[in-house]
Amino acid sequence: MPKMKSNRGAAKRFKRTGSGKFKHRQAFLNHILTKKTTKRKRHLRHTLVTSGSDQAALRRMLPYG
């Protein structure tokens, strides 16, 4: 049986943690930053863990992590 392909868009955006969850960077921090407050930009710098309802879809898209 051939290897499964990873979804390349998801592979660039999500990383699997040691416990099997997926972490990702927050959106809205690439451009048009002058109108956003310093507090908002500071909070957007942190990475997030995906919600439980998205875990199954991500496991299918990224079979090898």
UniProtKB/Swiss-Prot annotation:
Q: Which GO terms describe its biological process?
A: translation
Q: Which Pfam families match?
A: Ribosomal_L35p (PF01632)
Q: Which family does it belong to?
A: Belongs to the bacterial ribosomal protein bL35 family.
Q: Where is the composition biased (Basic residues)?
A: 10-23
The entry's keywords: Ribonucleoprotein, Ribosomal protein
Superkingdom of this protein's organism: Bacteria
Classification via InterPro entries: Ribosomal_bL35, Ribosomal_bL35-like, Ribosomal_bL35_CS, Ribosomal_bL35_sf
Q: What is this protein called?
A: Large ribosomal subunit protein bL35
